[in-house]
Curated annotation (Swiss-Prot):
Mediates both low-affinity uptake and efflux of sugar across the plasma membrane. Pfam families: MtN3_slv. Its main location: membrane. This is Bidirectional sugar transporter SWEET2a. One of its GO terms (biological process) is carbohydrate transport. Keywords: Cell membrane, Membrane, Repeat, Sugar transport, Transmembrane, Transmembrane helix, Transport. GO terms for molecular function: sugar transmembrane transporter activity. It comes from the Eukaryota. GO terms for cellular component: membrane; plasma membrane. The chain crosses the membrane at residues 24-44, 58-80, 90-110, 118-138, 146-166, 180-200, 203-223. Residues 45-57, 111-117, 167-179, 224-243 are cytoplasmic.
Length: 243
């Protein structure tokens, strides 16, 4: 039927445009995530230069490693179809977090080295159990739900971690420990993957990244409000905490 041809052409065009927007959002999310992954480099340069981990904590990197591994697993075809950009960004993130943890272990004192090594081993044990359960005991739809809910919980917990920084900014009325470009990158990454998840209609992607987007906006608003009261620019990466 001749009337069907324009409708089909319009449908194909809309689908292609949606796919292009989805791919673009995913690529943008990967780029902004990479900025976040390299943000701790000045901290580890300092650790290597001083030959000591000082008062820095390895916990953000240990947790980020587990988060990246879970989300990477969710993005693989074994678990989900069509979300390969989730797998790529988190595989890169896992490599960075593992490298940071290895450097931390190399320069930590004996007590910290033992503790962090045990935590690192625990991360791989937990991830191994997740892989085993999802592959050996669950069919594909149930597997996607299982790993998806784990990734949502993991991402929400990770996005909630800056709440302590937000609280510090409000209490001190200073953005010294909330770097602007890091906050901006977190917002842009979350917003990009929120759009990616919406376009894919993937609940497990757009819900946690929607929360991350809101938290990113809050950080940027606080930065704009308290910036004039700060005597200097932020000093430490957002993901680094002190013990």
């Amino acid at each position: 039927m001749d009337w069907a041809a324009p409708a089909l052409t319009s449908f194909v065009a809309d689908s292609s445009y949606r796919h292009l927007c989805c791919y673009g959002a995913g690529i943008a999310g990967n780029v902004f995530a990479f900025v976040l992954f390299i943000s701790p480099l000045p901290t580890f340069k300092r650790i290597v230069r001083n030959g000591s981990t000082e008062q820095f904590s390895a916990m953000p990197y240990i947790y980020s490693l587990l988060n990246c591994l879970i989300c990477m697993w969710y993005g693989l075809p074994f678990v989900s179809y069509g979300v390969v950009l989730v797998a790529t960004v988190n595989s890169i993130g896992a490599v960075f977090q593992l490298a940071y943890t290895a450097v931390f272990i190399a320069f930590a004192d004996a007590k910290q080295r033992l503790k962090v090594s045990a935590l690192l081993a625990a991360v791989f044990v937990v991830f191994g159990l997740i892989v085993f359960v999802s592959l050996a005991l669950l069919d594909h739809p149930t597997r996607q739900m299982f790993v998806g809910y784990l990734s949502v919980a993991s991402l929400i917990f990770m996005f909630a971690s800056p709440l302590s920084i937000i609280n510090l900014v409000i209490r001190t009325k200073s953005v010294e420990y909330m770097p602007f470009y890091l906050s901006l990158s977190m917002f842009l990454m979350s917003a990009s993957f929120f759009g990616y998840g919406v376009l894919l209609n993937d609940f497990f992607i757009y819900i946690p990244n929607g929360i991350g987007t809101i938290l990113g906006i809050i950080q940027l608003v606080l930065y704009a409000y308290f910036r004039k009261g700060s005597s200097e620019e932020a000093k430490l990466p957002l993901l680094v905490t002190h013990t």
